[in-house]
Amino acid sequence: MSDLQGGYKRGELTVHHDPSVLTRVSKALRGVGRQVALVPTMGALHTGHLELVRQAKLTGAVVIVSIFVNPLQFGAGEDLDAYPRTLDADLELLREAGVELAFVPTAATMYPAGPRTTIHPGPLGAELEGVSRPTHFAGMLTVVAKLLQIAAPNVAYFGEKDYQQLTLIRQMVTDLNFDVRIFGVPTVREHDGLALSSRNRYLDEAQRSAATALSAALIAGAHAAAGGAEAILATAREVLASVPEVEVDYLEVRGVDLGPAPERGDGRLLVAAKVGTTRLIDNVGVAVGTGFLERDAEPPSDASAADELLSR
């Protein structure tokens, strides 16, 4: 228990900056039988992040939220310097949510020798988002791998909005034998369907209105799923084409593992587009050729989802 001295206080938020200290605290908690859950973020927290926290807390775990704007996952011309940083407000939100541990490192503490060792994402990392952001996923997987090592959690939570990211993290955890469960949480949306994102704050009123075309297109495509992948895409394209402010990068139907779309079965419809200078992504599950998502037949309650995690 000595490793918990000053590093963890039940019911209070303790903020850690030193990776080695957080590792000691997490392992000490696990050593006395506590579950530890990690919610990695880049800050600028919103309701979507807090839903990840809520899901993590359902299991009774001690929740660690990391806040780190990772320079490795920003490419040339991307918005590293402009990315919103709202640490004081973020920590207050975590206190209100009942989070007990926050990890707020710097680039110097995360990469003391520079980014000399990185994780290669494999072929999937060069597709979809990887076409326009060729270095993004290597940077993302590298920081996630480090956070999993540092926080030493039983389970880590990621949003389904970044579906390719979630898929690659699951791939990495499987391929590299990480001893951690990865739990995907459904996308949280505004009342008008816009997926919550820290980048939404870059949109002016007109752009924000135009951006709702992404979710509208996805929903329309999902409703056309009984006609197969081509019907899904044709329907979604029609919606996007009706809003000229939306500059589409890609719109694709894939399998749930982001392999080729099935002729019949569960898949994923993914879109990326620019609205003004802001790049947005979104996705939904689609029942290709059937119009009925198998996984949505009986949505689990919060309690059953928590029970499922604890039983694994």
Swiss-Prot record:
GO MF term list: ATP binding; pantoate-beta-alanine ligase activity
Binding, (R)-pantoate: 73, 165
Binding, ATP: 42-49, 159-162, 188, 196-199
Classification via InterPro entries: Pantoate_ligase, Pantoate_ligase_C, Rossmann-like_a/b/a_fold
Residue positions of the active site: 49 (proton donor)
Record flagged with keyword Nucleotide-binding: yes
EC number(s) on file: 6.3.2.1
Keywords: ATP-binding, Cytoplasm, Ligase, Nucleotide-binding, Pantothenate biosynthesis
Biochemical pathway: Cofactor biosynthesis; (R)-pantothenate biosynthesis; (R)-pantothenate from (R)-pantoate and beta-alanine: step 1/1
Record-linked Pfam families: Pantoate_ligase
Catalytic activity entry: (R)-pantoate + beta-alanine + ATP = (R)-pantothenate + AMP + diphosphate + H(+)
Compartment(s) of residence: Cytoplasm
Disulfide links within the chain: none
Superkingdom per UniProt: Bacteria
Cellular component, GO annotation: cytosol
Residues that bind beta-alanine: 73
Keyword Transcription: no
SUPFAM superfamilies according to UniProt: Nucleotidylyl transferase (SSF52374)
Subunit text: Homodimer.
Physiological role: Catalyzes the condensation of pantoate with beta-alanine in an ATP-dependent reaction via a pantoyl-adenylate intermediate.
HAMAP family per the UniProt record, alphabetical: PanC
Family, similarity comment: Belongs to the pantothenate synthetase family.
Name of the featured protein: Pantothenate synthetase
Organism of derivation: Rhodococcus jostii (strain RHA1)
Lineage, opening ranks: Bacteria, Bacillati, Actinomycetota, Actinomycetes, Mycobacteriales
